[in-house]
């Protein structure tokens, strides 16, 4: 609601979230869904200079406003004493953005930017919608769900938040409508892959993952010998040299902007199990070996659990993923067409893939109710 209490002819919506693709991807997917419903809606994204949002939000065609980041230490450290001052500065900056936008609603996706945005919106009496991406909620969204709003939406059923309603995780329309088989030939040509060879896609998420990079690349010769080609996204700041030991390519990229093509090219993926990755991979029916990030609240293991429980994926602890494990297990799985087909069938439909439209409609309903 704007301060005057009247719904403007063109709603103004501020979306707060940043840091990693886990926050920016659902934000962009939601913005796209809002624009499909009403192309005139004013959409402003709120982020910090530290995150992926400084690149991907403008590339997606949305206005981005930056506020100072306020990392919240998980354990008592001297940095904790600086938090109140930083928070006041960041809340003030967020309030300025909300005021200038005449925001009708704030939608928060978590991350450093969300806590000050929630406080600023609450003080301004602007309606707040929280979307929690992980099975285990983060600090910012816990705070907002408890103190700031009753509009709390989650990516997974059973997430422990007050007022939680399961809607799923918004993902890009290019992913949710992907026909992997129809796009496979184009996708493999795009990445310079053989059109027919069994294909492994490897990704550690938007920042890459050293353990995954080292374990899979260390088994490159064995994968080649088994007749397997590899598409490996190593992360924007990482380097990796893999000797070409056979006729099939081992393609190394820092970042994949066309994830739809990467999923279409692949028969199997080795990946982390962030909420966005699990939703996209299972949504397109791609069999997966999930390697949960071994830090945080243990949310990545829980994110993958619904898919793994029905047989759509395999879960392996980060510490257990080694070169020897890859040699012993990946070729065996990737060359078993019957099992891959069963995994693909099992994964499809486990997790909702229409959350972008669902969340967009909820946001607009909140705006209408507040008017």
What are the residue ranges of the model-derived segments?
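A short, well-ordered alpha-helix in the C-terminal region of glycosyltransferases
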Residues: 339-353
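A short acidic/histidine/glycine-rich donor-binding loop in glycosyltransferase catalytic cores
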Residues: 288, 306-319, 331-332
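Active-site-proximal region of nucleotide-activated glycan assembly enzymes
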Residues: 122-185, 190
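C-terminal alpha-helical cap of glycosyltransferases
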Residues: 3-4, 332, 352-371
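Donor-nucleotide binding loops and adjacent catalytic segments primarily
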Residues: 46, 51, 56-60, 183-189, ...
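Glycosyltransferases and closely related glycan-assembly transferases
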Residues: 93-106, 114-129, 142-147
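Conserved nucleotide-sugar phosphate-binding/catalytic loop shared by glycosyltransferases and other
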Residues: 10-21, 40-91, 167, 319
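Conserved donor-binding/catalytic loop of nucleotide-activated donor transferases
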Residues: 124, 264-266, 282-291, 310
């Amino acid at each position: 609601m704007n301060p005057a209490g009247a719904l403007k002819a063109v709603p103004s919506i501020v979306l707060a979230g940043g840091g990693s693709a886990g926050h920016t991807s659902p934000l962009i997917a939601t913005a796209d869904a809002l624009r499909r419903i009403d192309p005139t809606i004013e959409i402003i994204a709120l982020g910090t200079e530290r995150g992926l949002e400084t690149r991907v939000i403008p590339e997606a065609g949305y206005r981005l406003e930056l506020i100072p980041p306020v990392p919240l230490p998980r354990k008592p450290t001297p940095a904790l004493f600086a938090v109140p001052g930083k928070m006041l500065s960041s809340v003030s900056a967020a309030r300025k953005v909300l005021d200038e936008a005449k925001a009708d609603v704030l939608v928060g996706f978590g991350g450093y930017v969300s806590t000050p945005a929630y406080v600023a919106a609450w003080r301004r009496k602007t309606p707040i919608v929280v979307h929690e991406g992980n099975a285990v909620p983060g600090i910012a969204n816990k705070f907002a769900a408890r103190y700031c709003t009753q509009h709390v939406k989650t990516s997974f059923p059973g997430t422990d938040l007050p007022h939680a309603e399961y809607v799923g995780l918004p993902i890009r329309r290019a992913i949710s409508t992907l026909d992997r088989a129809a796009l496979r030939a184009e996708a493999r040509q795009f990445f310079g892959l053989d059109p027919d060879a069994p294909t492994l896609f490897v990704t550690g998420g938007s920042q890459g993952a050293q353990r995954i990079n080292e374990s899979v690349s260390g088994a490159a010769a064995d994968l080649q010998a088994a007749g397997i080609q590899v598409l490996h996204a190593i992360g924007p700041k990482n380097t990796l040299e893999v000797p070409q030991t056979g006729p099939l390519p081992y393609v190394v990229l820092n970042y994949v902007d066309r994830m739809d093509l990467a999923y279409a090219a692949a028969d199997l993926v080795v990946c982390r199990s962030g909420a966005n990755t699990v939703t996209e991979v299972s949504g397109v029916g791609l069999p997966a070996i999930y390697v949960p990030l071994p830090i945080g609240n243990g949310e990545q293991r829980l994110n993958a659990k619904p898919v793994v429980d029905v047989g759509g994926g395999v879960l392996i602890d980060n510490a257990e993923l080694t070169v020897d494990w890859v040699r012993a297990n990946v070729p065996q799985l990737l060359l078993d067409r019957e099992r891959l087909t069963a995994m693909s069938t099992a994964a499809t439909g486990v997790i909702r893939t229409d959350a972008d439209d669902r969340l967009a409609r909820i946001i607009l309903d909140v705006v209408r109710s507040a008017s």
